[in-house]
Every structure is written in structure tokens, then in C-alpha cells.
UniProtKB/Swiss-Prot annotation:
It comes from the Archaea. It comes from Methanocaldococcus jannaschii (strain ATCC 43067 / DSM 2661 / JAL-1 / JCM 10045 / NBRC 100440) (Methanococcus jannaschii). It catalyses: molybdopterin + ATP + H(+) = adenylyl-molybdopterin + diphosphate. This is Probable molybdopterin adenylyltransferase. Catalyzes the adenylation of molybdopterin as part of the biosynthesis of the molybdenum-cofactor. It holds the Pfam family MoCF_biosynth. InterPro entries: MoaB, MoaB/Mog-like_dom_sf, MoaB/Mog_dom, MoCF_biosynth_CS. GO terms for cellular component: cytosol. GO terms for molecular function: ATP binding; molybdopterin adenylyltransferase activity.
Amino acid sequence: MHKRIKNIKYAVVTVSDSRYNDLIKGKEVDDKSGKLLKKELNAKVYTIIPDNKNMIKGIVEHIVEFFDVDCIVFTGGTGIAERDVTVEALKEIIEKELDGFKIIFQKLSYEEVGFSAMLSRAMAGIYKGKIIYALPGSVNACRTALKIIKEETGHILGHLREG
């Protein structure tokens, strides 16, 4: 039996050109999804970065190296627009993809939004013993994903730590 890890330490990263531009201009940032995830997961790290593959990969490396977290949750950049590169960036570095997350997330999303769920490219994977989730930028999608994340992250970590 795998031990379910408790007291999980999270980092939350919002990927959005517009929110990042507001941040660097000193404007108020309207990041409902990132703030929801930060609050619900009691995240120890929270940041906003632009839609840029190198920045996405770099922030993963930075968080893994300098912060004691078990899980990094990205929101934004998972759509089908040209600038949506979160999934592509993460797929370049993750060691194992957790395909079941995408399947379950799409099923739950379909129950809420119908066929529009097919536009979601949410994903999860493992990198250096950490779980990485990539979620859409919408608040409703993040709420849906939180059901899965809160329920299963401790179980996944138990498997990872068992070796």
C-alpha cells in the first residue's frame, strides 16, 4: 500500500502575456485563476510569467532548485492559440507524463461545458520527483482541476517517494 503524502507544498505559476505585462508596468493584475489556486493550495510560491517556452522551462528549473515544493501548478497557455506554449514547453522537460490526468480532467470538463472541453490541453507529468500540472487559464477549469489535484496529488507523491 502506497503512503499518501500529506502537507503537500505547492508552487503556482500563471502563464499570461497580458498579466505579465500588467505586472511589469506596475498595474493591478487581474489573475483570478492564479489567486484561486494559490489560496486553495496554500501555495508557498506564486509568480506570473509570459507565454514563452524558455521562461516556462526556466521557472520550473528555478522552483525545483531554490524552493522546497512537491508540486508546481501552471495555469494558462494550454489553449490552441499560437502563443499557448505551456504544454509544449513542459513536454520538453518532463520525465513521465500522467495521461490519466488529462483524461479525467476532460471528462469532468465535458460534464460542465460540453464539447468545448476538447479545446483543453491540460496535462500532468513528473519532473525530478515533483508533480507538474498544466491547467487552462479559466477560473472554472481551475476549480475543476482542483478536485483532482487535491484528491490525488498525495497519492502520486506516495508512489514517487516509494521509489
